[in-house]
Amino acid sequence: PSFLGKKFDALLLDKKIEVINAGITGTTSIEESYRIKNELVDFEPDLFIVYGGINDVNLDLEKHLNHSKLETTIQKQLLTFTQIVLPEYKTTLLAPYALNHIITDLRNEDIITSSQEIDETNILQISSLWKDRWTEICDIGDEKEFKMIIILQPILGSGNKTLTGWEYEFLQTHGGDHNKTVYDKFATGLYDLEKSCDKVIDLRNVFDDHPEQVYFDSAHVTKRGNEIVANQIFNIVSPMVLEDIS
């Protein structure tokens, strides 16, 4: 969000375009859609950009169906404070969490960071539930006059990126090609979303032309990776935003 906001600021427009990061690391479409419906709409936004996918993939079907079993871990509570309570979100705020994770080998079950493969058993049903949640929010957007953009994030192994030695080794010990196959099946939920949402963006291939290291685990990316993603989102989203304010 910080990089995206700076790109809009650089346009030097007469009207202020404010990019606000309302996301919380580790959450799924369950929490995100709830917050949009019950909290964030009160701020009367013009546009929501939803960026995610992998946390839903790695959440088991039982928790998708029974939301009461979702627990708020200490990690999530701390991340909520650093990303929502603190006035600004910076990529570096993730550094202590990432470092602690690497050193202690903690496993947050909502994020792919272990050596286990993603469970493929119910992936199409999970994809359908994910799609249905965002379809509902997009329909609410039509009623309340805000736009919705849904973005499927890249993960290590998605697309056709030439991997660095470290990325390749990490991928082989954290699910390998199996995880890519499962993620590609999950991505089928994107197609029906195009019927309800203002725009649907698939970023699985966003790093195809970037052979340098951009991942530091299965889903999180470096500062350079965030810049690449922000540039791609800006190029796609800015025409829509500029048209709305003209």
Task: Label each region the model flagged.
Residues 21-23, 152-153, 202-205:
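Residue-level recognition of beta-strand->loop/alpha-helix junctions
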Residues 54-191, 208-212:
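Serine-dependent acyl-ester chemistry module
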Residues 15-17, 43-48, 142-149, 196-199:
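Loop/turn elements at helix/coil->beta-strand transitions in domains of secreted/extracellular proteins
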Residues 1-25, 34-44, 49, 68-69, ...:
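Serine-esterase "nucleophile elbow" of acetyl-processing enzymes
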Residues 130, 190, 195, 199, ...:
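Histidine-centered active-site loop/cap adjacent to the catalytic His
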